Curated annotation (Swiss-Prot):
Membrane protein topology class: Peripheral membrane protein
Function of the protein: Could be involved in insertion of integral membrane proteins into the membrane.
UniProt-listed InterPro entries: Membr_insert_effic_factor_YidD
Organism whose genome encodes this protein: Clostridium kluyveri (strain ATCC 8527 / DSM 555 / NBRC 12016 / NCIMB 10680 / K1)
Protein name: Putative membrane protein insertion efficiency factor
Length: 69
């Protein structure tokens, strides 16, 4: 399951992301954060961290440097 999710993120980054205007308020980008979180913490904790991060990526959040810990 983890490999499948990582595959989906890579497909998104290669084919869908280039079509959009860059708008992520964080570094690393949300898609990179998701990849790192899944690889480092697994599907449960990494998935939860990813959802929290994506919900924070909005116009009302300042953004900035937010690495996977």
């Amino acid at each position: 399951m983890k490999k499948f999710l990582i595959f989906l993120i890579k497909v998104y980054r290669k084919y869908i992301s280039p079509l959009k205007v860059p708008c992520c308020r964080f570094y690393p980008t949300c898609s990179q954060y998701v990849l790192e979180a899944l690889q480092k913490h697994g599907i449960i904790k990494g998935g939860f961290m990813s959802i929290k991060r994506i919900l924070r990526c909005n116009p009302f959040c300042k953004g900035g440097y937010d690495p996977v810990k």
